[in-house]
Curated annotation (Swiss-Prot):
InterPro entries: FAD/NAD-bd_sf (IPR036188), Sti35 (IPR027495), Thi4_fam (IPR002922). It comes from Chlamydomonas reinhardtii (Chlamydomonas smithii). Signal peptide: none annotated. Gene3D superfamilies: 6.10.250.2840, FAD/NAD(P)-binding domain. It catalyses: [ADP-thiazole synthase]-L-cysteine + glycine + NAD(+) = [ADP-thiazole synthase]-dehydroalanine + ADP-5-ethyl-4-methylthiazole-2-carboxylate + nicotinamide + 3 H2O + 2 H(+). Its cofactor is Fe cation. Belongs to the THI4 family. Involved in biosynthesis of the thiamine precursor thiazole. Catalyzes the conversion of NAD and glycine to adenosine diphosphate 5-(2-hydroxyethyl)-4-methylthiazole-2-carboxylic acid (ADT), an adenylated thiazole intermediate. The reaction includes an iron-dependent sulfide transfer from a conserved cysteine residue of the protein to a thiazole intermediate. The enzyme can only undergo a single turnover, which suggests it is a suicide enzyme. May have additional roles in adaptation to various stress conditions and in DNA damage tolerance. GO terms for biological process: thiamine biosynthetic process; thiazole biosynthetic process. It is found in: Plastid, Chloroplast. Coiled coil: none annotated. The keyword Glycoprotein does not apply. This is Thiamine thiazole synthase, chloroplastic.
């Protein structure tokens, strides 16, 4: 009996499938002639305007023609420039991991105070900006507590002044403006859709016996990084850096990756990442800015990643601390570079003196 029922249901399913297939073909045949040609549309418009005693509509884009191009030219135009960037930024002064609000603010400030530095800005997503495209709970407006609004003035981003804070009409206005300023700097290269999979850590004699420093990042295209485990031999690439600024955000699938990796390497004081505390806007923003620092030699932490390592409160949907923490991180990065150069010079002088003795 069960077999007969299965056969019957199979026949019904086959009939329904045949009907749906036939219906799809019928719809496709009917749909094709329903789009009139542009010439027919233009003639109809001209006739209607003439009856109304109006001149024909013209636009600057009538009979628009593009310059000729070959597909191979497009290929070479993209490929040549991308690999030129990969070659030039294989050794960078600063690598910023994460192009959210803190990472972008850091890149912006580096361009202002040290435009000669070569800065590689890494972002695992196709679209940089992190969570700064919207305010809280997917709302449009962005709240920035004073005096962080001074950066908005510098960028000429309009806002509504509410006394102790300002409101940007749409968060995307600030983020897109900040991004455009960053990318105009010829010494900044954004590598989006590029994941940082690991850190380069090396011994540094200038730091004394057993001293280690972060010396760069291990990178891969994001889609390749997500496919690990499905294929073998998908080795990464590398970028050496004088200093790495980690702006990876709070914990999550792609969050706090820099400080979590340091913990696994035994380089975080206390040996673990406690995670951020409960939300307290009043306390959180000041804590984030004032604790922005070089956590280990060669690596500066900025933004909400600091809350993960310090156990400080989460901040919620206010963005002033992200902006100012990123800007402070830029100054910390420049100071770290200068300190490293001074230590290296002192170590070289000491080695030369010993050799002469």
């Amino acid at each position: 009996m069960a077999i007969k029922m299965n056969l019957a249901s199979s026949k019904v399913g086959a009939k329904a499938s045949a009907k749906s297939v036939r219906g799809a073909r019928l719809v496709a045949r009917v749909a094709q002639p329903m789009s009139p040609s542009s010439a027919a549309t233009a003639a109809a418009d001209a006739s209607m305007l003439a009856r109304a005693g109006l001149p024909p509509t013209t636009t600057p884009y009538d009979d628009y023609k593009f310059a000729p191009i070959r597909e191979a030219e497009v290929n070479r135009a993209m490929t040549r420039r991308y690999f030129k960037d990969m070659d030039e930024f294989a050794e960078s002064d600063v690598v910023i991991v994460g192009a959210g609000s803190a990472g972008l603010a850091c890149a912006f400030e580096l361009g202002r105070i040290a435009p000669h530095l070569k800065v590689a800005l890494m972002e695992q997503s196709v679209a940089p900006g992190g969570g700064a495209w919207l305010g809280g709970q997917l709302f449009s407006a962005m709240v920035v507590r004073k005096p962080a609004h001074e950066m908005l003035d510098a960028l000429q981003v309009p806002y509504e002044d509410e006394g102790h804070y300002v409101v940007v009409r749409h968060a995307a206005l600030l983020t897109s403006t900040l991004m455009s300023h960053v990318l105009k700097n010829p010494n900044v290269k954004l590598f989006n859709a590029t994941a940082v999979e690991d850190l380069i850590v090396k011994p540094d004699p200038a730091l004394g016996p057993g001293g280690r420093r972060v010396a760069g990042v291990v990178t891969n295209w994001s889609l390749v990084a997500q496919a690990h485990g499905t294929q073998s031999c998908m080795d990464p690439n590398v970028i050496e850096a004088g200093v790495v600024v980690s702006a990876c955000g709070h914990d999550g699938p792609f969050g706090a990756t820099g400080v979590k990796r340091l913990a696994r390497l035994g380089m975080v004081p206390g040996g673990e990442v406690p995670g951020m505390g409960a939300l307290d806007m009043e306390a959180a923003e000041g804590s984030i800015v004032n604790n922005t620092r070089e956590v280990v030699p060669g690596m500066v932490l900025t933004g909400m990643e600091l809350a993960e390592v310090d156990g400080s409160p989460r901040m919620g949907p206010t963005f002033g601390a992200m902006i100012v923490s990123g800007m402070r991180a830029a100054h910390m990065a420049v100071a770290a570079l200068e300190r490293r150069r001074a230590l290296s010079a002192a170590a070289a002088e000491g080695a030369a003196a010993e050799a002469q003795a």
